Amino acid sequence: MTGLKVDVDADEVGFDPQRLQRIDAHFRTYVDDGRLPGWLVLVSRAGKIAHLSTYGQRDVESALPVEEDTLFRIYSMTKPITSVAAMMLYEEGAFQLTDPVSRFIPSFADVRVYTGGSSGKPVTVPAVEPVRIWHLLTHTSGLTYGFHYVHPVDAIYRAAGYEFGAPPGMDLAAACDGWAALPLQFQPGSEWNYSVSTDVLGRVIEVASGMSLDRFFAERICSPLGMTDTAFHVPEAEQDRLGALYAVPAGQHEKVRHDAMGRTATRPPRLLAGGGGLISTAADYHRFTQMLLGCGELDGTRLLGTHTVAYMTRNQLPGGVDIETYGRPINAETGSKGIGFGLGFGVVDDPAEVKGLCSRGEYHWGGLASTAFWVDPAEELTVIFLTQLMPSSTYPIRPELRQLVYQALVD
């Protein structure tokens, strides 16, 4: 999608223009002192872009600037798109949210749960209830990520080759069978843990729809919404627009270029990762957030019903508790106190517990390379921040962005 531009004066939609400039002034320092390579920020209200700015470089070594059409690896900002895809199928009657995952992935019929022992000799018991589609959408399945480095099951994932993604050459179907053979961290539905659940959900989408995940995204979501640059890899003709990927290694303070991981975006992946595989642009993701703000509809194209979007963006954790209370808020991308979890989104339930400017009912997520977005229905506000620095916990970009956006609202 091209033609991204500011299309309303900020003061016409309740912003103080001078206060909005504080966003740019603050994040310029991140580039000037070398913490970030470059960034793009987009702030929209009532469907109109009120603030759009770029700064720094998409490729530091080649001195190429961040531009409005720069392509970014959005990593876990893929998850909301996968969740929307699943709920589109749910609306069509393809499954119930309570259906066992084993209906679509038979290897999930006999999962076992870790109860003790070591990562080398785990003690397990059968799952009391099946892993259900609802558990995948809410990250309450008991699955995990190998890169958490917290629980013995995390180490079991790493030993099996699942630290980041899956072993080379493995496709999504095989990865799901591999994950099903490993112990769950807890009984399904009993805790929250950020995990490969959304990748498994991607496989459910494939089986339920009879389409590969990339085809489903392209035909059912991206094409209808005009998201022309969003895909699982960047075509050769567009690769000069792709930002380089940087990382701050553990125990260090300086960012380094990470081409080994970054260059995977330039070729079609064997594993279509609904949990983190997409590359996109600010314009495309803006279209996606506007569809959400429009309760499932954008420019006459409806992907979801209004009640479905409302349900997805409501805290689904039992008793209305937050992520901090219900489970293991490791790598929750955007915080855990005062924040519940819906069907694919973190949801602000208690702004006082968040201890920062925000709105009740705002929903959001982020990605491994420090990207972030949120949708605030109460303020008709959407915000997108794109950069390419791993891990996302390196700097407090997301809370700082929140406070700088909300302090500029004056109506």
Predicted stretch roles:
Residues 102-109:
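Acidic helix-start/capping segments at beta-turn-to-alpha-helix junctions
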Residues 16, 79, 281:
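Short, conserved phosphate/pyrophosphate- and ester-handling motifs at nucleotide-, phospho-/glycolipid
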